[in-house]
Amino acid sequence: MQKFLKLVLVTFLFLISTLTPPANAENTINGEQIFSVHCAGCHINGSNIIRRGKNLQKKTLKKYGMDSLEAIEAIVTNGKNNMSAYKDRLSEQEIQDVAAYVLEQAEKGWR
């Protein structure tokens, strides 16, 4: 009987784990919405209409040391040069979400 209960419990836990979406899926969706509203005006499809060489492509992010969540969160929060700071417009969670979205899109080549 105990073996049966263990089997049922393990099966149940397995099914629950496969039905639950990844923890960051919602954050990425939120990040996409934030990006569309606040970032896409200058960074449409990962480009940069102000400074073409400072785009959001994976290679460029790596070149400038911006290929981590922390680095992207810092520049979104504080801004730099022509990039506006968003610390007064976005919550910390929104900044984290948009940073995750940018990294995910860079990995996918903004496709």
Curated annotation (Swiss-Prot):
User: Pfam families of this UniProt entry?
Assistant: Cytochrome_CBB3 (PF13442)
Q: Does the entry feature the keyword Ligase, yes or no?
A: no
Q: Where is the signal peptide?
A: 1-25
Which InterPro entries does the record match to this protein?
Cyt_c-like_dom, Cyt_c-like_dom_sf, Cyt_C6, Cyt_C_IC
| Ligand binding (heme c) | C39, C42, H43, M83
The answer on whether this UniProt entry bears the keyword Transmembrane reads no
Q: Gene3D superfamilies, from UniProt?
A: Cytochrome c-like domain (1.10.760.10)
Where does it live in the cell?
Answer: Cellular thylakoid lumen
* Keywords, comma-separated and alphabetical: Electron transport, Heme, Iron, Metal-binding, Signal, Thylakoid, Transport
Q: Quote the cellular component terms of the Gene Ontology held in the record.
A: plasma membrane-derived thylakoid lumen
Which PROSITE patterns does the UniProt entry name for this protein? Answer: CYTC (PS51007)
PTM notes: Binds 1 heme c group covalently per subunit.
Q: Name one GO molecular function term.
A: electron transfer activity
Q: Indicate the family of this protein.
A: Belongs to the cytochrome c family. PetJ subfamily.
Listed name of the protein = Cytochrome c6-like
Q: Which organism is it from?
A: Nostoc sp. (strain PCC 7120 / SAG 25.82 / UTEX 2576)
